[in-house]
Amino acid sequence: MVAGCAPTKTESPDSGQNQDASANNNDVSALNWRVPDFTYTNQEGKPFGLKDLQGKFWLADFIFTRCPNVCPPMTANMAKVQQELKKAGVQVELVSFSVDPEYDKPEVLKAYAEKHGADFSNWHLLTGYSLEEITKVTKDTFKAQIAHQKGTSPDVPLLVTHPTQFYLIDGTGKVVRFYNGLQPDAAQIAKDVASLNKGK
């Protein structure tokens, strides 16, 4: 069985209003959005947390494996971004948080990512937390919402509203940029990382 999902929005850094994932003004560095300390479980069944990302830029998104619409292209796009950043010599870790953690066990996440061409050398798919916890982190840190609803048919038993952005976080855990996860620009991400590195 599969589940339906729908995109949610992230607050605009300039107006305080919600904007969709294709918005051009994606610099949120002045807003001091910070990722709280965490230790979850990765696709290998091993602990992985914020301490493993200290001093590194990382790109985060929110997905679930039963999603039939936005998550497959997001995951494929993340794989493409991963390849392009490596070609450009830009070091960025990738982190995908499941918004369906009860179902998305480590082996489920690993098989899903493999199907979409993931390289696990710097891509970490996380689970091992409650829905309540990831919902709170998404709301408090990324100013977006996760909402589970009953599905519309036996084939779609679950509907999940979740963000479709890719979020760039710096080595201190501060969210500095976001991008449209359905149409990401790897060249722009690489340019932003290079610029932010120079500004350290």
In which residue ranges do the predicted regions lie?
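N-terminal "domain-start" segment that seeds a small globular fold
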Residues: 17-51, 76
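Bacterial signal peptide processing site
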Residues: 6-9
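Short active-site neighborhood of thiol/selenol oxidoreductases, capturing the structured segment around
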Residues: 48-72, 78, 94-95
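C-terminal motif of bacterial Sec signal peptides marking the signal peptidase cleavage site
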Residues: 2-4
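Thiol/disulfide oxidoreductase modules built on the thioredoxin-like
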Residues: 130-192
